[in-house]
A protein has these predicted regions:
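Cytosolic catalytic regions of ATP/NTP-dependent phosphoryl-transfer enzymes
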Residues: 291-427, 434, 447-448, 463-468, ...
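Hydrophobic alpha-helical transmembrane segments
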Residues: 60-96, 103, 198-294, 449-452, ...
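Cytosolic catalytic regions of P-type ion-transporting ATPases
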Residues: 65, 96-209, 409, 514
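Actuator/coupling domain of P-type ATPases
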Residues: 4-6, 16-27, 31, 74-76, ...
Length: 738
């Protein structure tokens, strides 16, 4: 164990070489191996790989074109995710948690992951404890262990008692001896459970996972039927043809690219927000913010700049102002001073004239701190706590609070300090008014949320009149203001809103906001927030600007809107394939397409346009019912396309699949045009390019031979007739739904 001066540089180096470093597993980033594993070794890739092998065995390599698309999707998804990961990791590194340690007798600020075993770590109110350890010294040290025990009440920590990583300091200060770091720490050993506690719920990911499960079950149930049907129709003459036709139908059920597009969409949103100084710590948070119905904000640092200015003292009961200034300087002379105490310290610098015998640190629950000097004990805190019965003092407090000032009372007692208890003899000595500047962008940001139908509540530990004055200045209704709320009351208020079915975002910067941030659907911290606050937040505003939230909501809406559009297309294709497989089984017909033709349709009418739709702009307001809207459109649209394809194929003079391919291509491009509205220049260019490529596939001899198209007047007319009828049905379905 290190000496009181901490480890030496040589001892630190020795432990680093031994691997006794606090390297932590991040919950927001995946390794390259993990990215490769999740993009390559998937159930759908395994199925497509097996189908590709079946095609290779038939010798019809051209029909294995979907294998190249599979590789392209995998490479694209891996490359995009790796690029986004590196971008986000660089930003996270710049804003990674820090800790104070004593090394070579000097208090040093280092990244928390650089702590080594046996380091002496200095902790104070608001700090997130990064390692397991034993308390060496305690100055009224209180730790919240709710992450580990579920108990919200802070625990007083004395010398020789243990503290654990993942907890945070609510009051006081102290030093600890790091006994377990990195994977050996308690919090890291229960990481899986800890992650469950804070991960945001993603409706999008839930819906996509359900769609993928539906498609997988469709494949497993219909694969035997498809193979049996095609062997029954063509097997006697040509098992290779039966295999190829079987694969064509089954490939259509597989949602090539849907998982990749979902991941890319979330990542591009996170990268875009990082450029706007918003760090996304959990990807689903982007979507969650767009679904928010209630926004709860803290006053200080969110509605105000957090920069405080202390007004001259309002002396009470004939106390000597010079002595009061010395007392305030001594009270503010605290390494763990919060913004309020720092403002007091700047106004009344410590002169060292006071001999401090004992002190009690500030606690957001009791709302006061105290020191004992030769002249008695001095208490600084909330007026209604320190002087709850003095009507004249409370009236002065009310008058000052109505101006928007934060008001503190300095009170004196001749008796010595009693730990965490107020004396019976306590006389008001002075009122201190501290003013904060309201953010210039706060009113516009609040108006934006109100226009979007989001209810806004202010939850603050300040005097209700102070909070109400600031709320009025930015346009928040007074009945939505809650003052003098404790951390537990903030948490309980969030829980109460949840019982009404609200989706809640909570912003905060203090350790008193941690419990509420964890209960909210999405917690948002300012960059100057306490380490514990940033540790539990899903988003961090890196420059502390509240005005970035509308941008984040726009990105969330883009994610939801774009993935909904993409899901419509993929599910319609799945339904078409399922309907076609069942229909040809009933009618004892060969499947209408070859695998290469399905690949052409999937690429030009689904894969490429879906990619551009997934990264495009979309500012539509969120409304519940993602899955129901997708099903209400995609199911009838897919059935309509499948019906048209089967009818057209049976009516065609040959079994080349040309007419069916034209029908399906045009129909799916019509779906793309429906969800690309209103057209932007980019969408118009993309759609026009895809149409030209489709025309080339049916008009250039080399391509028609490759795709086995029989381009005759009859096939073209039949295909166009089927596609026009289907496009009309799709348009009607879309208009009815909207």
């Amino acid at each position: 164990m290190g000496s009181p001066v901490g480890l030496t540089s040589q001892e630190v180096t020795t432990r680093q070489l031994q691997g006794l470093v606090n390297n932590l597993d991040t919950k927001t980033s995946r390794s390259l191996a993990h990215i490769l594993r999740t993009n390559v070794f998937t159930r759908f890739n395994a199925i497509l790989g097996a189908l590709f092998i079946a095609i290779v065995l038939t010798g019809s390599l051209a029909d294995g074109l979907f294998g190249l698309v599979l590789v392209a999707n995998t490479v694209l998804g891996t490359a995009q995710e790796w690029k986004a990961k590196r971008t986000l990791d660089r930003i996270r590194l710049l804003h990674s948690p820090t800790s104070h340690v004593i090394r070579d007798g000097v208090n040093q600020l280092i990244a928390s992951h650089e702590i080594v075993q046996d380091d002496v770590v200095v902790i104070s109110a608001g700090d997130h404890i990064a390692v397991d350890g034993v308390v060496l010294s305690s100055e009224n040290l209180e730790v919240n262990e709710s992450n580990l025990t579920g108990e919200a009440d802070a625990v007083m920590k004395l010398s020789e008692q243990r503290v654990f990583s993942g907890t945070f300091v609510t009051a006081g200060s102290g030093t600890i001896h790091a006994t377990a770091v990195g994977k050996e720490s308690y919090a890291q050993r229960i990481t899986a459970e800890a992650k469950k506690f804070t991960r945001p719920v993603s409706e999008i990911q839930d819906v996509v996972n359900r769609l993928l499960a539906w498609m997988l079950w469709s494949f497993l149930l219909l694969a035997p039927l498809q193979v049996w049907t095609q062997l029954r129709v063509d097997g006697d003459r040509n098992w290779q043809e039966a295999t190829v036709r079987s694969v064509a139908g089954l490939v259509g059920i597989i949602p090539e690219g849907l998982v990749v597009l979902t991941t890319i969409t979330f990542l591009t949103a996170a990268v875009a927000l990082s450029r706007q100084q918003v760090l996304v710590q959990q990807l689903p948070a982007v979507e969650t913010l767009a679904r928010v119905s209630v926004l709860c904000v803290d006053k200080t640092g969110t509605l105000t700049t957090g920069i405080m200015q202390c007004d001259p003292l309002l002396v009470l009961n004939s106390y000597d102002e010079t002595e009061l200034q010395d007392v305030l300087g001594a009270l503010a002379d605290d390494l763990a001073a919060n913004a309020t105490l720092q403002a007091i310290g700047q106004k009344f610098p410590s002169t060292q004239a006071m001999h401090v015998i004992a002190h009690i640190p500030f606690d957001s629950l009791k709302k006061w701190k105290a020191i004992q000097v030769d002249s008695g004990s001095w208490y600084l805190g909330a007026p209604e706590i320190l002087s709850s019965t003095d009507v004249s003092v409370l009236r002065k407090v009310q008058d000052l609070a109505h101006t928007g000032a934060r008001v503190l009372l300095l009170a004196h007692s001749p008796t010595p300090l009693t730990q965490n208890a107020l004396p019976s003899q306590l006389e008001p000595a002075a009122l201190i008014a501290i003013k904060e500047q309201v953010r210039q962008d706060a009113a516009l940001t609040i108006k934006y949320f109100c226009d979007q139908g989001v209810d806004i509540y202010v939850l603050s530990g300040d005097h209700p009149s102070t909070v109400a004055a600031v709320a009025r200045a930015v346009g928040i209704k007074e009945d939505h203001v809650r003052g003098r709320v404790t951390p537990e009351e903030k948490r309980d208020f969030i829980e109460q809103l949840h019982t009404r079915g609200e989706v809640i975002a909570m912003t905060g910067d203090g350790v008193n906001d941690v419990l509420a941030l964890k209960k909210a659907d999405i917690g948002i911290a300012m960059d100057n927030a306490a380490p514990a606050t940033k540790a539990v937040a899903e988003m961090i505003l890196l420059d502390g600007k509240f005005s970035h939230l509308p941008t984040a909501i726009t990105e969330g809406r883009r994610v939801i809107g774009n993935l909904e559009r993409v899901a419509h297309i993929f599910l319609a294709k799945n339904v078409m394939s399922v309907f076609s497989i069942i229909s040809v089984a009933v009618l004892s017909q060969p499947f209408p397409f070859l695998p290469r033709q399905m690949t052409l349709m999937s690429t030009l009418a689904i894969g490429i346009p879906a990619f551009f739709l997934a990264i495009g702009k979309s500012a539509r307001r969120y409304s519940p019912g993602f899955l129901s809207r997708v099903l209400q459109f995609s199911f009838p649209a897919g059935v309509a396309i499948g019906c048209a394809v089967v009818v057209v194929d049976i009516s065609a003079p040959d079994d080349s699949g040309t007419a069916a391919s034209i029908t399906a291509l045009v129909a799916f491009m019509w779906i793309v045009s429906v969800f690309a509205r209103p057209f932007t220049a980019r969408n118009a260019v993309v759609l026009a390019t895809l149409i030209i490529l489709a025309i080339c596939a049916f008009s250039i001899e080399m391509l028609t031979e490759f795709f086995s198209f029989s381009v005759t007047t009859h096939n073209i007319a039949l295909g166009m007739a089927g596609s026009f009828c289907t496009a009309g049905v799709i348009e009607v379905i879309h208009r009815i739904q909207h």
